[in-house]
């Protein structure tokens, strides 16, 4: 077995929570939804709960995930708590974590992007308004609806917020809430990681014990209740696609997203990422991959707002539509660079079966090289080809530190199995 961290050629970033800076953190997660990796990332997050001031864990869309799935992981944490607290008195008690686990939105609010307050959105507002002068870091692992609702209900909290959004597929499912934030709160301090997060499980050193399956088998299996629970997800293979948001706060310079760290290195966002069509499109129509596509199509003669409409992209993804009696409006965020087909289903015969497609393509260099003046604090995956892992922009800025963050994770996981001794504390 390779000695963990041996041979690491890059020095670990020396800032962040592991260097002693305590960050206020809320996690918004679609745990229990469509991707089991949120369970893995929650295990990872709780193992570092002693170095954060954890203020909330919110269940968010998309999918069937609920607060009870957060509690499921906290139950495992409770079984390991006796050992964990011997390493640090600052691990929160299981009941303290249960008290701040909140239910957020259950589904998208529709094209407006906002709807009614939820327990989760109200909790974000409450935490942001507290007297603590430190910023509040909101790590969004799933849908961004609760953050959008919080900003809508209390726009004055914006200066306090620092957001790390695991975008990509989550942005696709939450496009209306994303559109609301981007249009109405452009000065929000946010990192939009559409592909950078993939560096946690794609590329980097995957030889020997560093492989996604071999690492889990060697360093997570049999390490307490949390380790065993981790192994029940994704057949015991590391994905942890939301963990870069945690790594960003653990090691790096969270005040400056352009600097390297465990959660990646980012670039200022550019303009022109949203495309609006007033017609059905063809393959010759191009939009930006991971951008926003909006259709505002005049209703055909004879159609009224009482007629029903459903738009399905890629034969599987339904878009929420509005029909105001004059215009049919719907949005989509293409999560990959490819041709995206869509079809309209309606009880209005002239519209039913109408279809189209468009090509999502990477943005040109002349666009990405001009930072947006409208969004001065909005950051995104580094478009530099040298930072890409295959087709994933920015992913190398994470995976080049794979041995560091996985090695540290393995050391943390050992805490679950064995109580601390004076010797083990010194080694860590």
Residue ranges and their predicted role:
Residues 1-6:
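Bacterial N-terminal signal peptides
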Residues 12-428:
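N-terminal acidic, glycine/proline-rich low-complexity segments
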């Amino acid at each position: 077995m390779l000695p963990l961290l041996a041979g690491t050629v890059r020095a670990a970033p020396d800032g962040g929570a592991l260097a002693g800076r305590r960050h206020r953190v809320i996690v918004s997660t679609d745990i229990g939804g469509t991707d089991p990796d949120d369970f893995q990332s929650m295990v990872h997050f709780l193992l570092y709960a002693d170095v954060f001031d954890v203020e909330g864990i919110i269940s968010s869309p998309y999918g069937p995930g609920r607060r009870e799935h957060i509690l499921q992981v906290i139950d495992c944490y409770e079984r390991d708590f006796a050992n964990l607290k011997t390493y640090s008195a600052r691990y929160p008690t299981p009941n303290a974590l249960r008290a701040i686990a909140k239910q957020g939105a259950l589904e998208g609010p529709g094209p407006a992007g906002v709807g009614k307050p939820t327990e989760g959105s109200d909790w974000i507002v409450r935490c942001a308004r507290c007297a603590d002068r430190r910023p509040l870091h909101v790590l969004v692992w799933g849908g961004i609806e609760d953050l959008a609702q919080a900003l809508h209900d209390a726009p004055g909290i914006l200066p306090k917020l620092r957001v790390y959004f695991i975008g990509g597929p989550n942005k696709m499912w939450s496009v209306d809430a994303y559109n609301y934030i981007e249009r109405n709160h452009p000065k929000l301090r946010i990192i939009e990681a559409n592909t950078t997060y993939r560096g946690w499980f794609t590329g980097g050193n995957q030889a020997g014990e560093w492989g996604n399956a071999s690492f889990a088998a060697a360093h997570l299996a049999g390490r307490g209740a949390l380790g065993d629970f981790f192994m029940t997800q994704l057949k015991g293979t590391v994905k942890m696609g939301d963990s870069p948001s945690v790594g960003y706060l653990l090691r790096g310079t969270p005040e400056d997203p352009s600097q390297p760290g465990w959660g990646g290195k980012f670039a200022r966002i550019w303009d022109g990422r949203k495309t609006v069509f007033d017609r059905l499109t063809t393959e010759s129509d191009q939009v930006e991959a991971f951008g926003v596509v909006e259709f505002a199509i005049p209703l055909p003669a004879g159609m009224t707002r009482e007629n029903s409409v459903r738009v399905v992209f890629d034969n599987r993804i339904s878009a929420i539509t509005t029909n105001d009696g004059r215009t049919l409006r719907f949005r989509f965020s293409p999560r990959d660079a490819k041709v995206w087909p869509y079809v309209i289903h309606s009880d209005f015969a002239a519209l039913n079966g109408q279809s189209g497609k468009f090509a999502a393509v990477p943005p040109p260099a002349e666009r990405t090289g001009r930072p947006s003046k409208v969004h001065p604090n909005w950051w995104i995956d580094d478009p530099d080809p040298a930072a890409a892992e295959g087709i994933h922009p920015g992913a190398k800025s994470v995976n080049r530190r794979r041995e560091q963050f996985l090695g540290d994770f393995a050391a943390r996981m050992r805490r679950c199995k064995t109580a601390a001794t004076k010797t083990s504390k010194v080694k860590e």
